[in-house]
Amino acid sequence: MALILLTVAACLYSTGAGNIFGAKVDWSSQHSVFPEYFRQQFYRTGQFFPEFALNIGGGQNIYNFSYYGLFSPVVLIGYLLPNVKMSDYMMVASIVCLAAAVIILYRWLKSREFTAAVSGMTALMFLFAGPMIYQSSHQIMFVNYMPFLCLTFCGIDRYFEQKKSGLLIGGTFLMIMTSFYFSIGGILALGLYGIYRYARTKERAEEMITVKGFLGDGLRFAGRILTAIMLAGVLLVPTAMALLGRSGSKGEKTDLWQLLTPQINLEKFLYGAYGPGLSCLMLIILLTGLFYKKAYEKILSLGCLVVLTVPFFSYLLNGALYVRPKSLIPFLPLMCYLTAKYLEKLKNQKIGRIWMLLPCLAVVIYIYLKKDDMKSEVLWKLLLLDAVITLLICVAQAYSVWIRKYLTVAVLGPVILSLIITGSYSWEKSGNLESRKAYEEDTSRAIGKAVDKAITSDGGFYRVEQVGNEEKNAENLNRVWNSEQYITSLYSSSYNADYQNFRKNDFQVEQPYRNFLMQSVSQNPVFRQLMGVKYLISSQNVPGYEKKWMTRGGDVYCNENAAPIAYKTNQTMSEAEYDRLDFPYNQLVFTRYAVTKDGTVSAEQVKEELAEDVEKCDFRIPEKNNGISLVVPTENGYQVKMKKAQEFEVAVPEQEEKDGVLFVQFRIENKKPKKDIEISLEGERNKLSSIQHMYYNGNTVFTYAVGLEKGQKTVRLSLGKGEYTIKDMSAYTGVLNEGTDLYQSVFRVDKEQTKGNLIQGRIKSQKDGMFITSIPFDKGFEMTIDGVKVKCEKVNKAFLGFHLEAGKHKIRILYHAPGVTAGKILTGLGVLIVIAGAVRKKKCAE
């Protein structure tokens, strides 16, 4: 009970005054929002195994988002609480998971015959380890599997001592379903502990270990783990298929020799929230373990040391994408076990003095020599102090009975204190917890009612998006309020590659965030029209949109010229001709033509048609040199040096007759590539992230399309802090053609039938043409026209379409996530194996 209360108190204390136990961006836009969406879809469809997420990112394979808890038992419990906000539930669930992990770890250590003092202090060290509390409110998938991982360690003991497999298989299965990404490291840690327990069991039974016996017993143990993996097949197989279709995360360039050379990044490896997060005592224990008397104890220490220090394992556990210590977090319980073992041996004086002191000295010297490699001198001093204190305690306990009596507190007390200090420092430095006020605003049901009003007022197939400043947009990247609300934005580590490429390279949508994975709602009016964003929920006026209603959750704006999500047209141009179009024609063409494999018009014809609506214009940034801002024209652009962000007024041609659009594009060359650059035009922001950023966005071409109101003569340009060159600038003014006959026949969606992985409706067409959607293309689609299966093709460079003959038709679009059937079969086989094992065991018992 004391450990539970302490865990809850530590979590509440970490939030500070006026905050919630949840962070901005990742937690608020992913880890709390995706579970809400999964629950919404379950309520809407009743399907326990969904396949498609039509509502997010234009419409994508739902297994792109499985990382965020699609089948997590932690999330599934929330399905039983329909009147509770999923975000509220996830906060409570994270604290419960953390408390459960601490208690199970404590009980596991007690079952291994460690004293209550050793078990309790080690459990506290586990609680205050860098990632545990921090990630429970940030990226919860980093740690929320810990109760099941700790339970599986208990299952291994039970397997070797009682020959019972249930807890081993069940714990591994639940760990995988909770966080498949981190379960890989978890299984490796379980494997190391399994070898250790096997050897120890054989020793106690006074049995010899033979190669044949080890291989046979090892295969039987691995079979239990494999059974758990098979049980999780319904998650793992379709997720693997979805990940294979991802691009853009090709991983870091790696050198084989560097991967195989042991190394420790002290700042990331120790204390940090993105690694195991223990103190330098962990290194001392691993080194000391190499000198234990028993071979299996040496093997366990050596195995952990190799995995934790050789980058190859971190690289492998991160899916061969990069070398980051986050994949080593699952080794934390095993390190706690080794800590308890070390304290037991130290107290019973089973470690020779020289083997006790040498590792301490080695770590002290290593930390001292690494001073120049560490960014934080404060952390370096803390590490050095921590190592020196451990050294002094080890020396003192050899001569003092009193210190040996209170050895656990003497050794782990300073460690826990240092973990608390560094943890508090990390929380304060990050400063990214969501304030309670902002949280209540972001999750206010009034916004949901505004969305509902827009949806219920329109029987068509359109999108409704929520827009605000960039911070608010980041919070809402994946947020949908209604199962019939569809949005274009997305923030996920896995995504539809065609859609991502279209946004970035073909259409060139603005990139307001430093993380390339964050695909924001766009302020580009042409993109909004193309994607069928008919309604916007906003607190500010939106050019090109008419205010329809005022609500407590925001004003509802409407654009009657937005494209339907699906329609038929015979106005087409080929992909080859589209690729010849430059900016802004590569955007505006979508207001007049659909791009198909074989089109009817040329790039020259498109430019001629658009000439009456598009005009090249000057866009001259005012020259300035006042000691804070330096803006100097060059032959091909501007040289900019800003000590802080500053706003400029730039003259543009007046819109005399009606609202228009200003198109601006230029290249950016960062003179200080380790710093971010951001430039905003009329509030539309582009950002180039530091080349050192984990998810570098590569946004070196800034593209803008901003609405201009009738009579507007100037626009606001904000140049961000930094030193950079603007070059190859082009600017145009234009108007969006309101009289377009591109959308010749509109798809009438059946809202009752359209749910889950099914889109159904009718269309009436007088001419042959192409059925065009703004749903990203995927090979998993199966389409029928009047019950007859037809071949789908990619249209508009990234979206779903097919040929449609004249007449009245019933359209049915069904999505099958690749790998789902195979995954279900694998899970079924796993269930049969478990049943067969249970039956066999029962017969043997009889």
Language-model-derived ranges and their functions:
Residues 3-9, 94-108, 116-200, 220-240, ...:
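Membrane-embedded helix bundles of polyisoprenyl
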Residues 6-102, 124-146, 243-248, 256-274, ...:
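Membrane-interface coil-to-helix junctions
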Residues 35, 615-846:
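Active-site-proximal, structured, solvent-exposed surfaces of multi-pass membrane proteins
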Residues 58, 414-438, 455-529, 563, ...:
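Extracytoplasmic/lumenal acceptor-recognition loop(s) of multi-pass membrane glycoenzymes
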Residues 77, 486-626, 697-701:
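A cross-kingdom signal targeting lumenal/periplasmic-facing segments of multi-pass membrane
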Residues 101-109, 148-160, 188-196, 283-287, ...:
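Transmembrane alpha-helical segments
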Residues 182, 296-309, 316-444, 808-846:
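Contiguous transmembrane helix-bundle modules in multi-pass membrane proteins
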Residues 213-329, 371-378:
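Periplasmic/ER-lumenal interhelical loops and adjacent helix-loop junctions
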